[in-house]
Amino acid sequence: MTLFILAETSAGYALLKAKDKKLLKRHDIVAETQTAEGVSNLMKLKNFQKFDSAATALEETASLVEGKVTPRLANLLESIKDEKKVSLAVADPKLGNAIAKLPLAIQPIADSTTTDLYRAIREHLPTLIPGLLPGDMSTMSLGLSHSLARHKLKFSPDKIDTMIVQAIALLDDLDKELNTYAMRVKEWYGWHFPELAKILNDNIAYSKVVLKVGMRSNFGETDLAEILPEEIEAVVKAAADRSMGTEISNEDLDNIQALAEEVIGFSTYRQQLASYLAARMTAIAPNLTALVGELVGARLIAHAGSLVNLSKSPASTIQILGAEKALFRALKTKHDTPKYGLIYHASLIGQATGKNKGKMARYLAAKAAIGLRVDALTDWPVDADGNEPTEEEKAALGMQSRYYLEKKLAAMEGKPIKPRGVGIAPNGIPTAQPKKWEINEARKYNPDADGFAGDEDLAESSPKKQKKEKKDKKKKLVEEIKESEDGSESEEESDEDVEMADKSATNGSMADANASSEERSDREEKSKKSKEKSLEKKSKKEDKKSKKQKSGSGPSVEEMAAKAGLSVSRYQRKLERGEIVFDSEGNPSYISKKDLKKAKKEAKKAAKAAEKEAGKKRKRAEEDDEKKTKKKSKV
């Protein structure tokens, strides 16, 4: 089999032919190729196709890096298709796979056996290609490497989102450092003025006040209208007058103010960085930003490495991106896998509650996957004036998807959706943002909490206690049924009837007398009904008491269930099925289903054995009877 060697150089393609067909199987290639004469004895130049210009060299090299066969290389390989049983040594395995797909009877070889051969070709390339000087070769290689690096930097989409990855990482670091420094300022200056930290919650306002005022004694003379409102300023100055803090030296104050200045500088730079990140996200991934927001989108891109890598991920991967630890732990322990990762912090998922969070995460990840592919892979057309589409037009898909998801979430939750920018807690309730400053009223003295002498009256009970007492009274009135005697009731009714009759007689009209008689009859019926109801209630109460007394004579169901180690409902079920067994002392114990089955099988076996024995006894008795009858007949 004839062996050809393909050498890709900065000057062009060189096709070399090996003089020995078994050149790759030889073990002395390194020793033979140490000199130019040895290399020329092993192979010779078959064909050389030179690049026309630097632009052509760049195009060909860029295609080779991606593992593609260019038309120029395909024409070169067609020159050896007439050879019988051709094998071609290639340095790059990707290029070898691409050559194998061509409709040519060429068998590419791209393994470790060709490394020594290509090392020798690179060392002695000018001797193998006539007319190629070593100085020209180095110049062409340097120019090609520079142009190739420039081409990669210009056209690589991964280089743009590097700014986002670095910005979000720096933003997280700034938040940590800012919180640490702000807490250190409060703790440090708190020795001198501890009440200020309780009034001012905002770290920037606190640092500005410390930087402007300095010592606590200067608060009365300093104007803080630029930093604080008038009400808060008055409270701060009043607290400074009666502060319980210790005195500090000027050197201590200088160090505290230097740290406060750092806090203010960090906070201003953080705001600038956050606005820069929002602008970069809107420009690079407008649809993703419209769906999940700037911070969540930037964290997703940073976690995936680049926008292109994230766009290649399916929706299921985007949904749990950032929850890899929980995912692999769940797979290892065979538990439920997590429903969301970094995407959980999106506002749409935050507004969902309960089981709807998982559904919303799935919907949002699916829409985000589509939006990411549009952001990463779409080439936006340019109009006649050379203007690209606006940011709103680029983010149209993301805005439509968000509107659709908001409608779906509103239908699932049955409530209106909160506007963007509202902080949402995990339970779906908007979180109250911390105020910059608070005025806490001092707790007043409660004289009712003191002890009292015997002559004094008790303090009035609180409204909560009064409500409880009223409820207890109502319950007692409902529970207690006052039952009057039948005779007294009848006497009261007769007295009422006599009074009504007297009144009707005084009126002196028969119509009034008839009306009073009808009223009497109605009242009598009502009294009878009330008596019957009271008697029914009495009988029911007596029945309940008797049942309780009967049940109280022995252990209760709850006690028996506790002894058996079962719940009450389960104990009652097993008792009905006959699965509860009592020992000699009356303690219950339950039998499992397996034990019941075994007992039933043993009972069946015992019954069968008893039947067999009974049958045998019958046969014996019959045989004995037959023998007796035979003896009698003989006699």
Curated annotation (Swiss-Prot):
InterPro entries xref list: Nop56/Nop58 (IPR045056), NOP58/56_N (IPR012974), Nop_C (IPR042239), Nop_dom (IPR002687), Nop_dom_sf (IPR036070), NOSIC (IPR012976)
Keyword Coiled coil found: no
Any single GO BP term: rRNA processing
Pfam families: Nop, NOP5NT
Entry's localization field: Nucleus, Nucleolus
Segments for region (Disordered): 445-635
Extent of Basic and acidic residues compositional bias: 517-545, 604-628
Chain intervals with Acidic residues compositional bias: 486-499
GO molecular function, one term: snoRNA binding
Residues covered by the Nop domain: 284-414
Family: Belongs to the NOP5/NOP56 family.
Protein name, UniProt field: Nucleolar protein 58
Source species of the chain: Ajellomyces capsulatus (strain NAm1 / WU24) (Darling's disease fungus)
Gene: NOP58
